[in-house]
């Protein structure tokens, strides 16, 4: 059979795929979601339409369009067929022909073919000298599958990554090789702040399956003490260990972990190749807790394609269900479903933040406070969790001008939580608005700016304090320069508007207030209050 030419080289949209996740299929003119494409009657038309379908991430349509192209022997056409099949989650029929190809997509497709056929020996030989970060999971698990875990452990030590990841993957290897004591030791060495929900479920499943209840309880306490993990306090639908055990499942987990922990990769076209790799090689893992639906939906959400289909597929007992609703609310602006779900899951912090910001934005103080109160009344919440939500209540009261209530909450919060940037910023703003403790407020604000000069909220805090401490002109020196380049932080523009209004510059004041309204979905300003200020100027 003829030698397949180097795959994808002649397809313009696949000009480059790198470990840094350079764009492959970015589309400047995105079609309307759900648009129906007609099937061309000519082979040439079908070929062009297939390339376009891949270009706009409509992979299912791409596969349908290739049905009349399967007998065309042109390398360009065959390459397009291979790619369309794989990106739709199907192993290409002639994937074995890609053995000697060098491009990244072709190598991944052939690697998936080897794993699907349990040919771990050839996979190991292909990757045993591969030092690339992208291929690390393939090299590690091919070595382990060939009883060369010593090689895998040595390779892990050489990788320029953080210690928690190294401990995690070492734990995976020991767990797979049934050295449960060493596995547990490594899992316990993982910093809880490293874990996302998928990582947490993996370790919890390991602990529960192997009767390590004390360790499971410790992990539950540590993970749920963080704002991102609070939603798991009452969650008990931990997957069976069989969903993670086995070389295929372990590799699949590692690939998803790499995608989920690398933000630049998570939203890139490289992520789609790896996620389809997982679906094809480890279908049992891929259906566990709708993890793949969430990450596939995330890819389409941040690019183009039918993200809604994947989020809608997530079952209500999945920990990813609420994240899917949150993404949908962000995209559509409709919060009804998220609001109903949050009533059942009051400790899902991203939903709390989203809904509170929405109610502050629209002047619904009582609704914003009700969400916080509902969370604080949850029986599973610990003292640190209540303090966290009390900090949110302080922000609500500050936004609506109830400074005494905000200060009261902040005193309680500072007794239970370490002083973070949010606490320091809010305290400095309260003092500034009350025109007291201005030297301390200035010290707090300067500390925030020095700690993170890129934080617009820190500059907003400094500007508000300087306005009270040194006057409007000094504050303008701070806020105007930041406002020229800032696309976030509605309160900064409200404060700019206040200063312009105090100086009698009506036009600049109104422009700043309008900009504050445009950015007000961050929950830092109240639209009805800003509109009232605008009316007073007209």
Task: Please place each PLM-identified region on the residue numbering.
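Terminal, low-structured helical/coil segments at or just beyond the last alpha-helical repeat
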Residues: 252, 502, 507-538
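Amphipathic hydrophobic-ligand
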Residues: 406
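Hydrophobic membrane-insertion alpha-helices, especially the h-region
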Residues: 9-22
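C-terminal soluble interaction/assembly domains
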Residues: 426, 461-464, 468, 480, ...
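Alpha-helical solenoid repeat scaffolds
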Residues: 25-373, 382-403, 418-434, 450, ...
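Short coil/turn linkers that connect adjacent helices within long alpha-helical scaffolds
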Residues: 342, 380, 414, 449, ...
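Positively charged n-region of N-terminal signal peptides that target proteins for export
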Residues: 1-6
